[in-house]
Amino acid sequence: MRLSFKVMLIVVLSSVFASAQTQAPAAAAQHFDKGGLAFDYANGWSLKDMSNDDAQEFGLSNNAADVQMRVFVHKGKVTADKLPDAKKAFIDPYVAAVEKQFVQMGATPQKSADTSEIGGVKADGVLLSASLGGDPGAAKFYWAIVGQRVVVMTLFGPDRDIKKFAPAWDLLRNTIKVEEPKPAASPSPKPSP
């Protein structure tokens, strides 16, 4: 009788844990849609618009995280054969500037190639790993052409927070959509009486 009670208790507890895991609500998301760029981002994250005439640029931060996410979308149309030129013009200098900043902070960054996806499109990338004050971290850069525009996404932070907040990064990265901006609605002429 004692053995069957233990078995029954294990089955019940396993069922409760499995039920709790499968019924956990998905994190609610906020939606951004402006100028042909749309994406979702997790609740609790603040969105800062740093856009200019050349690009839409947004920074995302969370008071509970030592992580920053950035989205940069160049406003000009780019074809696949022109992506190397765009990389040379503004992606490589951006990566180099962050690498230099790590060195100025006393770190010895290790640079390696990486890949990911942005909005379902294969993205090339660079991973800069470094330890600041004994705390390992990284800056991850990814770029791809999405909707005929160059999209660059960056994730900065200590490894522990990058791992902890990976679902927020994945939500942002996977929901990026770029379309032609919809023209402003113009009033239709009214017939004269």
Q: How would you name each of these model-derived features?
A:
Residues S51-A139, I145:
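Conserved polar/disulfide-associated segments of primarily extracytoplasmic proteins
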Residues Q23-A55:
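N-terminal "mature-domain start" segment
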Residues G36, P84-P93, D159-D170:
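Soluble non-cytosolic domains of exported or imported proteins
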Residues M1-L3:
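N-terminal secretory signal peptides that target proteins for export/translocation
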Residues F39, N43, D92, A96, ...:
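Solvent-exposed, polar/charged alpha-helical surfaces in well-ordered, non-transmembrane soluble domains
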Residues K6-V16:
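Bacterial N-terminal signal peptides
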Residues A20-A24, K190-P193:
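Disordered, low-complexity segments in secreted/periplasmic proteins that are enriched in proline
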